[in-house]
Design a protein with these regions (language model features):
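Short, surface-exposed interaction patches in beta-rich subdomains
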Residues: 156-158, 173-185, 189-291
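Positively charged n-region of N-terminal signal peptides that target proteins for export
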Residues: 1-4
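Hydrophobic h-region of N-terminal signal peptides that target proteins for export
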Residues: 10-18
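Beta-strand-rich extracellular passenger or scaffold domains
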Residues: 108-115, 134-135, 192, 211, ...
Length: 291
């Protein structure tokens, strides 16, 4: 009986301690990037001074590792050293980060990020994988490269000179910005909604990717294969080159010229009064005007 009571008391104390939250602040060197995975829920704020703090259960706090290497802030949870009971009862760890400049974001696992404030790095790199959720990012940069994979959901606004997006898996990406040159590569069952203006737009998608564009570009190149869908009816371009294969579907709005190579069971639908420059169709492919 005493052993049972002792065991129950120990269990009660352990559960009670799991419910206690503590806040910890960390003294770290200057950083301009963030790397986090697992179950970190990050609130990012633009500030003139850098700071980092976490809020978590008291027993879990000792397993949180915060470090900076080559200007990259790393948030990590040492699950290898954690007792099994802690692993089973671990909830999201809240992290509060303030920084003056942001040029890199690498998130994985089930990490979350909510950002406020605009950042102006010369270059920006973003990598979001797993089941990441990131929104509120406002980036203004000369050069940018963003990769989104898995079941991640990412929202980015701002202004870029040259920007490249690679989306895959079942990821969902929402973009709102101006750019000089935008490149998008999509595969799997990924989805993207883009709103903005660009001088040059190059979109290449495959699989069951779905991309919707709103805004305008001077020149554009659209390539779609598999069962992908590219809806650019409300994305007005002057001149466009199009290549469609498989059973892909492309909608476009053109004021200047269209050059197109359409094959398989793919369909090209267009709005506007463009000049048909170089047109090739084969198999069951078709070109139709949007009425």
């Amino acid at each position: 009986m005493k052993k049972i009571l002792t065991l129950l008391l120990s269990l009660f104390v352990s559960v009670l301690m799991l419910g206690q939250e503590i806040n910890r602040s960390y003294q770290v060197p200057l950083f301009t990037g963030i790397e986090a995975g697992g179950i970190f829920d990050i609130t990012l704020t633009k500030s003139s001074q850098n700071s980092v703090s976490t809020t978590s259960n008291k027993e879990i706090a000792k397993y949180i590792n915060v470090s900076v290497k080559n200007g990259l802030l790393k948030l990590d949870l040492d699950t290898d050293s954690m007792p099994a009971m802690l692993k089973r009862n671990t909830k999201y760890i809240k992290a509060q980060i303030a920084m003056n400049q942001l040029d890199r974001v690498y998130l994985s696992g089930a990490a979350k990020l909510k950002s406020s404030g605009a950042f102006y790095p010369a270059t920006f790199r973003g990598d979001f994988s797993g089941a990441v959720i990131a929104d509120g990012l406002v980036i203004n940069s000369e050069e940018s490269s963003v990769q989104v994979s898995g079941a991640s959901k990412v929202e980015i606004k701002g202004k870029f000179k040259n920007v490249k997006y690679d989306i895959s898996g079942a990821s969902v990406v929402t973009i709102e910005h101006e750019s000089t040159d935008i490149k998008v590569g999509g595969s799997g069952a990924s989805k993207m909604e883009y709103t903005g203006t660009s001088t040059i737009a190059n979109i290449s998608i495959s699989g069951a990717t779905n991309v919707k564009l709103k805004g305008s570009a001077t020149t554009a190149s659209f390539e779609a294969s598999g069962a992908s869908q590219l809806d650019a009816e409300y994305f007005i371009v002057r001149d466009v080159e199009i290549e469609a294969s498989g059973v892909s579907n492309i909608r476009t709005n053109v004021t200047g010229t269209i050059s197109a190579e359409i094959s398989g069971g793919s369909v090209l639908r267009y709005a506007g009064n463009p000049t048909m420059k170089n047109i090739e169709t084969s198999s069951q492919a078709s070109i139709q005007r949007i009425k």
